A protein has these predicted regions:
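N-terminal interaction/assembly modules
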Residues: 1-122, 126-153
Length: 153
């Protein structure tokens, strides 16, 4: 595993952990998403600065794009409203959709595979299939130009 790949994988895990926590206690009372991130035990235990910065970039990007990401997830999760999707799966879907749509340097296949790895680690037995189905449909539409962005599969 290359150093960049390992850093990004660990960064995704860290971003996922904080994003998942935010699904229970969203920013409120003067606490910004960034402040919560900086105070998160998972972040304060981490010593690798590049990893912390990458996870922070992901989290803040996801948080600022959450409405659009939820619209995309809702469009591709047939018969599943956002409110019905389990918090683990929703956090993984938001993270992966963000990478698929906004991170030009992450190939579509890599974004999907990394989401499946998160689902294997944190989800239940059905998580990976559910996540793969949604993300594969999103990636196909990105690949065919429906999202007005250009990426490699």
């Amino acid at each position: 595993m290359s150093q960049t790949k390992g850093l990004r994988r660990k960064g995704r895990v860290l971003a996922f952990q904080v994003l998942y926590g935010l699904s229970f206690v969203p920013p409120h009372g003067g606490w910004s998403c960034e402040r919560i991130y900086n105070q998160s035990p998972a972040v304060t235990r981490e010593t690798e600065e590049d990893l912390i910065l990458y996870a922070r970039e992901l989290l803040l990007g996801i948080w600022s794009s959450q409405e659009e990401l939820d619209e995309v997830i809702g469009r591709y999760s047939k018969h599943w409203k956002i409110e019905r999707i389990a918090k683990v799966e929703l956090a993984i879907l938001r993270l992966a959709a963000y990478e698929l749509i906004y991170k030009a340097d992450i190939p579509l296949k890599v974004g999907i595979n990394e989401a499946i790895e998160l689902a294997k680690k944190f989800g239940d037995g059905n998580s990976r299939n559910f996540i793969n189905g949604i993300l594969d449909a999103v990636a196909r539409d990105i690949d065919t130009g429906k999202f007005k962005i250009t990426k490699k599969f």
